[in-house]
Amino acid sequence: AMDEQGDATQAVTCFTKMCDQGITALVGDVTTTPTLALAAESADYNMPMVTASATAEAVTYDAETDTVNENVFRATFTDPFQGIKMADYAYQRLGYTKAAVIFQKGADYNEGLAENFVNEFESLGGTIVDQETYSEGDVDYKTQLTTILGKAPEVVFCPNYYQEVGQILAQAESIGLAVPFLGGDGWDGLEGYATADQLKDAYFCANYAKGSNPDFENAYKA
């Protein structure tokens, strides 16, 4: 096992070192961008690779050539699935017709979910009143959030990782952006990064095995 620090270049370096050590299969990566780099690299070795959490469709399928990455396997859903389902939930289940989106630009995961949410929400008849982006490493989102506030959305889709989501929710609260936020599986891990008040009426899409925690399920249904 090696730590690639969430970086695509470092992931390939770690993979090369492990190949020199004689590995015959690869479990990983965790997030989308380094996994995409490893998918391409492992194909050159014809090495089996499985990821439990990278959701970009391109991890297992090359749309440009319409070919499946035959050595790469995924044990989770995809960005299109998440983005589409959250748009369906927002429009059909929650009844929202005006949405805004805030996401990190240049990030495969964030952009993938945002694109699919926007396309599905609009196809259902909803209106995307604003799309705001930020750069990797940013910690101040108030400018984007203030712009969103001025567009008066009923809901905000925030397909980012939990560290940034915690900051975004806190800053949204501080400027009075009091609408529900929705997200993807990158929100999983928010405990300790956001308060219960900030997460009121918030929803996100994540992996869950039905029947794995019957006590909780029964208590929730009750």
What are these regions (language model features)?
Residues D7, A11, D79-G83, N110-L113, ...:
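Conserved donor sugar-nucleotide recognition element shared by glycan-biosynthetic enzymes
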Residues A1-T9, D130-D140:
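Short beta->alpha junction loops
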Residues A8-T24, Y89, V139-P153:
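Short, well-structured alpha-helical segments in soluble
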Residues N116-V118, V165, A209-A222:
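Extracellular/periplasmic ligand-binding modules, especially the Venus flytrap/periplasmic-binding
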Residues T32-A43, V139-D140, L149-I175:
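Hydrophobic alpha-helical
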Residues F15-D20, A40-D44, T146-L149, E173-S174, ...:
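Mature extracellular/periplasmic domains of secretome proteins
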Residues I23-E132, P180-N207:
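Extracytoplasmic ligand/sensor domains, especially the bilobed periplasmic-binding protein
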